[in-house]
Amino acid sequence: LPNVLNDVNALSTKYGSILDYYESLNLIKRKPVSKRIVINDIKITLVPANEEGTVTIFVFEQNGKKLIYAPCDVKPFPNSRLFNDADYLIIGNTIIGNNLKNNFYLTKNNPLNLELFSFEEVLEIKAKYNIQNVVFTHLEEDWGKSYDDYLNLEKECIAVKFAYDGMTIEL
């Protein structure tokens, strides 16, 4: 997406563009992608998550399997038939529960609810698109939950996992 590439190309040091430097050393090759790219036999489709085209959801497809990666800032979740029947949705920027750190209770009218998905909203996305499994990532310690708290929640829900460093997913 052009806006995303412009933002990435703007990354620089006092010496200039970081990516220009890496490309001059033949370490990288930039290739603008507007809708999709195929690498070997993996098709990667880019779905804009906002009108400005600055936030992207990535849909990976290979051998009849499908994984959606929706990292950050994807609320509201865009409508796309491409999401139907995915094997996995990996999603970030969520709030799990209303009882947060230091006895803070997140009310329905809190502005965070406009930016971040609740656990229940993610389950609604899962149901709407018939997604088989969900992995929550970018878990925030600020919410006051330990990883054990997330593991206990996993036991209560079918096909829901919470990411951890080094996690791998087999499709």
Give the location of each predicted region:
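Cap/insert and terminal regions of metallo-dependent hydrolase folds
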Residues: P76-M167
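Binuclear metal-dependent hydrolase catalytic cores
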Residues: L1-Y69, V74-R81, Y147-L171
